[in-house]
């Protein structure tokens, strides 16, 4: 099945960024807005990607 690229709910700070029609989210407490996306894994936690497109390509 297709895994969605999502933000981890417990780390979130939103910045004014929008890539490919999707909102980017950012890790709290990292200083500035370094974007990341996660691709959830059932058994291994999550893979992290710096752009929505990279995440999308890996998840689908």
Curated annotation (Swiss-Prot):
Matches recorded under InterPro entries: Kunitz_BPTI_sf (IPR036880)
Domain called BPTI/Kunitz inhibitor: residue spans: 5-59
One MF term in the entry's GO annotations: serine-type endopeptidase inhibitor activity
Record key words, sorted: Disulfide bond, Protease inhibitor, Serine protease inhibitor
Residue pairs linked by disulfide bridges in the UniProt entry: 5-59, 15-39, 33-55
Transferase recorded as keyword: no
Miscellaneous notes: The inhibition of factor Xa seems to be reversible and stoichiometric.
Cited function: TAP is a slow, tight-binding inhibitor of blood coagulation, specific for factor Xa.
Name of the protein in question: Tick anticoagulant peptide
């Amino acid at each position: 099945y297709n895994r969605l690229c999502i933000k981890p709910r417990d780390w979130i700070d939103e910045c004014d960024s929008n890539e490919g029609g999707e909102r980017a989210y950012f890790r709290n407490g990292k200083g500035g807005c370094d974007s990341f996306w996660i691709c959830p894994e059932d058994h291994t936690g999550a893979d992290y990607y710096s752009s929505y497109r990279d995440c999308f390509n890996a998840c689908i």
